[in-house]
Amino acid sequence: LAELGADTYNIIQVFFETKTKTYAALERLALDSMRMYFSDRCALICITQDMYKRSGSDESETDRIANLPRQIEGVLVGITMRELKDGSYKASVRTHGEIGASSICKRLGGGGHMGAAGCTLYGSKQQAINSLLKEVQAELDSVTID
């Protein structure tokens, strides 16, 4: 595109650096919900339907949020849970190193690959979190962490 005269600066700005106001509001609420587990090796965000309402956002704006928990220094497992309209929870798991996101999610009926995977959880928010944390603990215990 650059060779054809496209304004690459503006393209990058629009596609990679610009956030909608509703996304920024949702991101703030999501980060405020973050909890750390297992000596800060796991960070978990839970986005609720109420957060969508409060931010004016919707599920279409959550893809970039899925990577935020893993970006924190020292975090090996980053989880973003989204409450769906039916009350279930979609979990996106992102991992570093030898920690297998797919191993965590497969045990919960989901799938993916080593560094990124997902699953759907049923029950209350706390039940969903507890199910995820049980599998994260099992995965952390199964690998040697330097």
What is each PLM-predicted segment?
Residues 1-107, 112-146:
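Hydrophobic helix-and-loop "lid/oligomerization" segment in the mid-to-C-terminal part
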